[in-house]
Curated annotation (Swiss-Prot):
Record-linked InterPro entries: Daa-tRNA_deacyls_DTD, DTD-like_sf
A Gene Ontology biological process term: D-amino acid catabolic process
Biological role stated in the UniProt entry: An aminoacyl-tRNA editing enzyme that deacylates mischarged D-aminoacyl-tRNAs. Also deacylates mischarged glycyl-tRNA(Ala), protecting cells against glycine mischarging by AlaRS. Acts via tRNA-based rather than protein-based catalysis; rejects L-amino acids rather than detecting D-amino acids in the active site. By recycling D-aminoacyl-tRNA to D-amino acids and free tRNA molecules, this enzyme counteracts the toxicity associated with the formation of D-aminoacyl-tRNA entities in vivo and helps enforce protein L-homochirality.
Catalytic activity: glycyl-tRNA(Ala) + H2O = tRNA(Ala) + glycine + H(+); a D-aminoacyl-tRNA + H2O = a tRNA + a D-alpha-amino acid + H(+)
Gene Ontology CC entries for this record: cytoplasm
Motif (Gly-cisPro motif, important for rejection of L-amino acids): 138-139
Annotated localization: Cytoplasm
Domain characteristics, as noted in the entry: A Gly-cisPro motif from one monomer fits into the active site of the other monomer to allow specific chiral rejection of L-amino acids.
Protein name, as recorded: D-aminoacyl-tRNA deacylase
HAMAP family noted in UniProt: Deacylase_Dtd
GO molecular function: D-tyrosyl-tRNA(Tyr) deacylase activity; Gly-tRNA(Ala) deacylase activity; Ser(Gly)-tRNA(Ala) hydrolase activity; tRNA binding
Length: 150
């Protein structure tokens, strides 16, 4: 499971011209799922993301988590995070899970993030053509891969 987590002032998802969801201050998490991902990956990533100390404390030091900052989280599926650009100029997405595997994993991840956060997360729609609008704060952007725990 690979995520790109961005600290945002606000973010929203629009599908077919209709607002699907939005958040204020918090995290926008783009998540890509591959076949070898497990429930353990879901739990590890959800805990890691909700406890990342990337929000400023009273001294302006990044020392607070999204939970401590009272922030929100939006999770959006993005299979292109598993693109391979090794050969040629056209990315290959063979490592990305097919929907029959990825959809249940995505739903489980959203649910686990919500449990860790203590409130439901906002989401996009799996597989939809979405317009994501965000105001990146910092910018702070963190890439995490559960298959490569650095």
């Amino acid at each position: 499971m690979r995520t790109v987590t961005q600290r945002v002032q606000h973010a929203s998802v629009t599908i077919d011209g209709q607002l699907k969801s939005k958040i204020g201050k918090g995290l926008l998490v783009l998540v890509g799922i591959e076949d070898k991902d497990t429930q353990e990956d879901i739990e590890w990533l959800a805990k890691k993301i909700t406890n990342l100390r990337i929000f400023d404390d009273e001294n302006g030091v990044m020392n607070r988590s999204v939970i401590e900052a009272g922030g929100e989280i939006m999770v959006v599926s993005q299979f292109t995070l598993h693109a391979s650009t090794k050969k040629g100029n056209r990315p290959s997405y063979l490592k990305a899970s097919k929907p029959d595997i990825a959809i249940p994993m995505y739903k489980a991840f959203c649910e686990e993030v919500g449990l860790q956060l203590g409130k439901p997360v906002q989401t996009g729609t799996f597989g939809a053509d979405m317009k994501i609008e965000l105001l990146n704060d910092g910018p702070v952007t963190i890439i995490i891969d559960s298959q490569n725990k650095e």
